[in-house]
Structures are given as C-alpha cells and as structure tokens.
Amino acid sequence: MIGYGHSVHLQTHWRDNQGALFPLSPPCTLVTFSDAVARSVLESHDKLFMRWESAFDQGHHTAWWHIIKDQAVTLSDLSSNTRSKVRRGLKSFDCASISRDTVLSEAYEVYKSAFARYETHEKEFSRNEFLNAVKALPDQTEFWGVRDKVSGALVAFSENYVEAEVSFYNTIWFEPSALRKYSSYALFYEMNLHYLEERKFRYVSDGARSLSHDTQIHDFLESKFGFRKAYARLHVVYAPWLRVAVAVAFPLRNLIEKVRLGPFKKASILLKQEEIRRECAKVAN
C-alpha cells in the first residue's frame, strides 16, 4: 500500500503502518537495541507492535529475508530470454525518474488499475486518499515512471525509499495492459542500472518476505534479474494486550488461516509473523 507515517527512533527511520512500526532505514544500518528498549518506544507511541531485523545478510539461513541485488548487471549479463523481454519493453516504453508532482497529477489511475490485481486485505484508496498519501511520503522518496512511447501516457510508477546508498523499491504499480508488453522488465532493468551502476549504491531491495499477499514479484526478480535472499533474524515486540492475544491464538493459527473474512486475514498475517519470529529465535539460540 502506498503511503505511511514516518518518524525517527533509535537512530533509525521508521514507517508507521496500520498502528505498527517497521524500519524504513535499510537493515544493514540498524543499530543494536534490546527488546526492552523497543518496548519503551512502542509504549511511548501507543503502537500495536514494533518489528525489526538483526544479523542481516551474515550467511545464516533463516525464515526471514529481504530480496536484494548488490551486483551491477548490464544487458549482456542477463539470460537471452530476459534480454529479449527487456529490449521489447524498452522499445515500447520510456523509463525515467519523475517528480512527486507528476505522481500527484498522473498516477492515480495507474494505482487503481494495478490495485485490482492484488489479493490483499488492504483497502483501495480514493483519489484524495492517494494524493494525501503521496504528499506525506518522506523527502528521501524517489519516483520512477514508465510512459508509453506512442501515447506518452504514464502506465507504471515506482516509489523508492533511498537512504545510506540503498534503494528500497517500496511500492510499484503497473497497468495490466503494460505488463503484457514487458514494462516491468524495462523498469527494473533501468532502475537497477541507475542505482547500482550509475550511482554505485550498496544494493537495491524489493523488501522483506511478504506476509499479506503473493505478487510473485520476488521469484521474478530472483530468476530474471539476479536478486537474492539476504537472510536476517526477525524481532517483534507487542503491546501488552496484543502479546497475550497472540500467545493465546498461536496454537489455533492453522484454523484461523482458513477463515477468509477480513479480521481473520489480519490475524493470520500477525500469527504468521509470530511463527517466523519464533523460528528465527530458535536459529539464534
């Protein structure tokens, strides 16, 4: 979902989403802090839970990861099939950095058509909600757009959070008709080239393992563009009442997952996160 509140705690930028705190700062930059310190931040801001990572990309396989690319790649480095699709995408579309004003004036219809593709519990934004969300994004946000070469129409856009020579491809929205013409191949190729080759960033990332929906985008990036899993240990602390609720509901997680109603979907996501947290704790111990 595009749009979120943001704040700074523990020398880290945080994203406030649906009453919880998630790191915006890259996991490679996070300072070490205890669960007790995290609970004090959580309580002072009256949030439901706080999530973060440690031991990022240290070679230990865990149940939690980010999908990253840390090696610059030219077109000739890609498979012949991927090269062909990138070229076909670039033949039909122009991909370039765009301004926030351009997103505000042109991107809502792209967002709306792309949103319909996702199976998610999240609510679709109205135009005004979308505009307010884009306006509120942090100054570290960079936008990329994809335009049809014939019509000039915007058919896709990406919202990237940039910090410490890392670009996080936070949300990306494609019109379905543009996807069929390989717009995604063109956009990822151009953004990877820009950040890794031209600006010499440490890495680019499409974010952490998804809990709420399956876009298959991570598999796509791994198989087509050489992204990889950077494993980490997942940490979560909860508000006191939620900690009790999670502990009580955890043995019922498989049953709750089968109920497709909205509140149960959210509960299932929360319990999946807790399952991963426990698995990571076992590895650490």
Stretch-by-stretch model annotation:
Residues 45, 137-138, 199:
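A structural signal for short coil/turn segments at secondary-structure junctions
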Residues 1-17, 52-59, 68-180, 195:
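A conserved beta-strand-loop-helix scaffold within acyl/acetyltransferase catalytic domains
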Residues 31-39, 127-129, 186-190:
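Well-ordered, non-membrane alpha-helical segments in soluble/globular domains
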Residues 142-244:
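Aromatic (often tryptophan-rich) hydrophobic motifs at membrane interfaces
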Residues 29-32, 103, 208-214:
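Acidic-and-aromatic substrate-binding clefts and catalytic sites of carbohydrate-active enzymes
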Residues 1-17, 55-75, 201-285:
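Active-site/acyl-donor-binding loops of N-acyltransferases
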